[in-house]
Amino acid sequence: MGQKTNPIGNRLGIIRGWDSNWYGGNDYGDKIAEDYKIRKYIHARLSKASVSKVIIERTLKLVTVTITTARPGIIIGKGGQEVDKLKEELKKVTDKEVQINIFEIKRPELDAFLVATSICRQIESRISYRRAIKMAIAASMRMNAEGIKVLISGRLNGAEMARSEGFKEGRVPLSTFRADIDYALAEAHTTYGRMGIKVWIMKGEVYGKRDLSPLAGMDKKQAGQGGGKGGDSPRGDRKPFNKGGKPDARKRK
């Protein structure tokens, strides 16, 4: 079942926490819809800021929105002007006081959502999907990821029939609950239609008790940009795999 389920939802309450933390009474449905609007608005408004997670916490009169990003300087702006504007805009959505916290992602190469969106942008810029995926895999492995798997589906290279093609390096044990696996899905909009990109990144294994907060281990930042360098790590063999379509050309030789 680990191959079929969402790796994040499958580990909730074990090694992962929830991205929405509040008590819902009779207006539970309204709060769910409001959370969706907040996340959709932030991702659209801050599309150039490399936003990954939007974590929402609620009290009776306050909504706390925590944004994890690789480029906090874009969100904060000069003297905090941009974050103040965002706060006022979110007040109109929630009709409550809004507090915004910003956390920096120091190694965006290990964030599945940022890796998936980066691949999408390159495909939309007409870069070969194989080149974009292999570069993303190499960057993640350089940052000491234990494994990464990427699956792309759609009309690859403009083919008439849609198919799926995958790339894998290292180990990604989806059935091991203690495995810290990040997962994301993103879509690339091309002239041939939409392409779906799924990314799984294995960061390591968790032993013993762990803080289930979604922000466990992250540092709060006021400004600056994400990034950082990591040492080289031993890699497994890269294993391309196909689902449907033509078999791998290397196998026909």
Swiss-Prot record:
One of its GO terms (cellular component) is cytosolic small ribosomal subunit. It comes from the Bacteria. Pfam families: KH_2, Ribosomal_S3_C. Gene3D superfamilies: 3.30.300.20, Ribosomal protein S3, C-terminal domain (3.30.1140.32). Residues 232-253 have a biased composition (Basic and acidic residues). Keywords: Ribonucleoprotein, Ribosomal protein, RNA-binding, rRNA-binding. SUPFAM superfamilies: Prokaryotic type KH domain (KH-domain type II), Ribosomal protein S3 C-terminal domain. Residues 38-106 form the KH type-2 domain. GO terms for biological process: translation. GO terms for molecular function: mRNA binding; rRNA binding; structural constituent of ribosome. Transmembrane segments: none annotated. Signal peptide: none annotated. Residues 216-253 are annotated as: Disordered. Binds the lower part of the 30S subunit head. Binds mRNA in the 70S ribosome, positioning it for translation. Belongs to the universal ribosomal protein uS3 family. Part of the 30S ribosomal subunit. Forms a tight complex with proteins S10 and S14. This is Small ribosomal subunit protein uS3. It comes from Flavobacterium psychrophilum (strain ATCC 49511 / DSM 21280 / CIP 103535 / JIP02/86). The gene is rpsC.
